[in-house]
From Swiss-Prot:
Primary localisation category: membrane
Gene: HLA-DRA
Organism from which the protein derives: Homo sapiens (Human)
Keywords: Adaptive immunity, Cell membrane, Cytoplasmic vesicle, Disulfide bond, Endoplasmic reticulum, Endosome, Glycoprotein, Host-virus interaction, Immunity, Isopeptide bond, Lysosome, Membrane, MHC II, Signal, Transmembrane, Transmembrane helix, Ubl conjugation
UniProt region (Alpha-1), positions on chain: 26-109
InterPro entries tied to this protein: Ig-like_dom, Ig-like_dom_sf, Ig-like_fold, Ig/MHC_CS, Ig_C1-set, MHC/Immunoglobulin, MHC_I/II-like_Ag-recog, MHC_II_a/b_N
Documented effect of changing residue 242 to V: In allele DRA*01:01
Protein name: HLA class II histocompatibility antigen, DR alpha chain
CDD domains, sorted: IgC1_MHC_II_alpha_HLA-DR
Effect ascribed to mutating residue 93 to L: Decreases the affinity of the interaction with TCR by more than five-fold
Length: 254
């Protein structure tokens, strides 16, 4: 789906407990962020809670239900999705007012920084996960496509919601399970209003380089030299020991 239209960022709330920006003489240990926004012309929004940089939950606007990042969280807490939907409705109304007051000024586009990495050290034919980390961008609208050997891949892909940053920009993670091989190459293609053209980040298996023959020869020669030196030194000590023993025998007992 191509990105089109002029984005207007809606009501964006960041509620920080014991924030470092506050003038209180208290050193924060943990930070909870409530982030919500509404976008036009997409008519889409998001409501989520973040704890120390990790998502706790978000509300699925289409299904009207709370989605916990980890199922275990839902066993110890609860959140009514209707509360988030009511907030988004207020955000939409506020956006209409703010848009008129700003004379329909669009939001400034900040292009993302994109990094592709693996979830764990890579071993051939061992299951792994490619991670496409999209960071430091606004507005929170991106299209992300995984490519294997230049062709789109959709099987098994997953993603996070838009995660807030302390500088009011956003970050997002996209995941692709895969089996590393020497034949396949991968790309994460990112589209955003701040980019003149789609941004591709490439990944392929990089086998460890074997030691060059000259290096192996040097290592072998060094090992041989060390071995010869050890033999020579050992022989010298043996000869000295024998000489001392013979001298003691010639002197006889006192």
């Amino acid at each position: 789906m191509a990105i089109s239209g002029v984005p207007v960022l809606g009501f964006f709330i960041i509620a920080v407990l014991m924030s470092a920006q506050e003038s209180w003489a208290i050193k924060e240990e943990h930070v909870i962020i409530q982030a919500e926004f509404y976008l036009n012309p997409d008519q889409s929004g998001e409501f989520m809670f973040d704890f120390d940089g990790d998502e706790i939950f978000h509300v699925d606007m289409a299904k009207k239900e709370t989605v916990w990042r980890l199922e275990e969280f839902g066993r110890f807490a609860s959140f009514e999705a209707q509360g988030a939907l009511a907030n988004i409705a207020v955000d939409k109304a506020n956006l209409e007012i703010m848009t008129k007051r700003s004379n329909y000024t669009p939001i400034t586009n900040v292009p993302p920084e994109v990094t592709v990495l693996t979830n764990s050290p890579v071993e051939l034919r061992e299951p792994n996960v490619l991670i496409c980390f999209i960071d430091k961008f606004t507005p929170p609208v991106v299209n992300v496509t995984w490519l294997r050997n230049g062709k789109p891949v959709t099987t098994g892909v997953s993603e996070t919601v838009f995660l807030p940053r302390e500088d009011h920009l956003f970050r997002k993670f996209h995941y692709l399970p895969f089996l590393p091989s020497t034949e396949d190459v991968y790309d994460c293609r990112v589209e955003h209003w701040g980019l003149d053209e789609p941004l591709l980040k490439h990944w392929e298996f990089d086998a460890p380089s074997p030691l060059p023959e000259t290096t192996e020869n040097v290592v072998c020669a060094l090992g041989l030299t060390v071995g010869l030196v050890g033999i020579i030194i050992g022989t010298i000590f043996i000869i000295k020991g024998l000489r001392k023993s013979n001298a003691a025998e010639r002197r006889g007992p006192l």
